[in-house]
UniProtKB/Swiss-Prot annotation:
Naturally occurring in which organism (per UniProt): Wolinella succinogenes (strain ATCC 29543 / DSM 1740 / CCUG 13145 / JCM 31913 / LMG 7466 / NCTC 11488 / FDC 602W) (Vibrio succinogenes)
Residue spans crossing the bilayer: none
Keyword Signal belongs to the record: yes
Cited PANTHER family: FLAGELLAR P-RING PERIPLASMIC PROTEIN FLGI, FLAGELLAR P-RING PROTEIN
GO-annotated cellular components: bacterial-type flagellum basal body, distal rod, P ring; outer membrane-bounded periplasmic space
Keyword Aminoacyl-tRNA synthetase in annotation: no
HAMAP family named in the record: FlgI
Compartmental location: Periplasm; Bacterial flagellum basal body
Name of the protein described by the UniProt record: Flagellar P-ring protein
Length: 349
């Protein structure tokens, strides 16, 4: 016996959502970006929760560290459990100057039980070119406690807030430049054309030209510095054409969809579940309220919207309340998408 679920609503038209957005929120300036840094170090001062003595690379690292301070010892003779080998990562923001501080993430790579209470000893951080750009040292912050067990949430990774000092700058000269390039965060011909049009109208002259659906070349006016020009560019607003997207976390069943993602007329059967979206209206006064403007008729197993237009999120939540598993919800939404009743991209995590 199949279980019929009918979602009743008026017929609707689909369109991409338009909203005003600043250029700084939808585009990046090419070359102005973070750079990744990485290093290998040791965390000391652990209360017996460090790497085991069988971790040879840790014991060898301890021996090498001690030798750097004129203490010579064979790695095989080290029996300490208060030290852990870690990878240290950080992001070097654009225009960082010597002496600036950045946050650091420290992660265990051995068999340590916890980094809580430990101190990272001086660790150089290098870029992809192998050059040292920062150094890091300091006490590790693990974070909050687990409410259920009372222990640390994830004791094998921690932060050093402001724990790295910039030693080398990455040169980026804007002062002498006469041009720059904008890169839209998503490719779209309409958005690229709107950015070009809005900028040229705002400045009263041609300062922008779109060369593809993602890239806009800029030419600063002679009367402005590059910093002043880019600051003004970033504040210009356009009617941004935002494409609808549905994101589903398969592990948790979480469905995230924009408010404009609607469901059109369709009939989908998945196992014992049948979804029918039709333009007719239902008049069942005894229906159970499922939330999100959707009601369930106990007599006919029918979901109705009482004249409202359902969204993907409201349909998914109604299915979950009826006992559909995350896999069922994903399969149903995929089928609806293939039928053309959802004008949005579907992304499964």
């Amino acid at each position: 016996m199949s279980k019929a679920i009918k979602i009743l609503l008026p017929l609707l038209l689909f369109s991409l959502s338009l909203q005003a957005e600043r250029i700084k929120d939808i585009a990046n300036i090419v070359g102005v970006r973070d750079n990744q840094l990485i290093g290998y170090g040791l965390v000391v001062g652990l209360n017996g929760t460090g790497d085991k003595t069988t971790s040879k690379f840790t014991m060898q690292s301890i021996a090498n560290m001690l030798e750097s301070v004129n203490v010579k010892i064979d790695a095989d003779d080290i029996k300490s459990k208060n030290v852990a080998a870690v990878m240290v990562t950080a992001k070097l923001p654009p225009f960082s100057r010597q002496g600036d501080k950045v946050d650091v993430l420290v992660s265990s790579i051995g068999d340590a039980k916890s980094l809580e209470g430990g101190t990272l000893i001086l660790t150089p951080l290098t870029g992809v070119d192998g050059r040292i750009y920062a150094t890091s040292q300091g006490a590790i912050s693990i974070g909050g406690k687990n409410e259920r067990g009372g222990g640390v949430n994830h004791p094998l990774a921690g932060m050093l807030y402001g724990g790295a000092i910039i030693e080398r700058e990455i040169p980026l000269d804007l002062y002498s430049k006469t041009g720059a390039t904008l890169s839209l965060k998503s490719s779209n011909f309409q958005n690229a054309a709107r950015v070009q049009e809005s900028l040229n109208q705002n400045f009263g002259t041609q300062v922008a030209i779109a060369i593809d659906p993602r890239t806009i070349k800029l030419q600063r006016p002679e009367s402005m510095s590059m910093v002043e020009f880019l600051a003004r560019v970033e504040e210009v607003e356009i009617d941004y054409n935002r494409e609808n997207k549905i994101v589903i976390d398969e592990r948790t069943g979480t469905v995230v969809a924009g408010v404009g993602v609607k469901v059109g007329p369709v009939v989908v059967t998945h196992g014992e579940i049948t979804i029918k979206i039709t333009p007719e209206m239902s008049a069942d006064n005894g229906a159970m309220d499922m939330g999100e403007g959707i009601k369930l008729s106990l007599n006919t197993n029918t979901l109705s919207t009482s004249g409202q237009t359902p969204t993907v999120s409201s349909v998914a939540r109604a299915l979950q309340r009826m006992g559909a598993t995350p896999k069922d919800v994903i399969s149903i939404l995929e089928a609806i998408k293939r039928s053309g009743a959802i004008s949005a991209d579907l992304e499964i995590l």
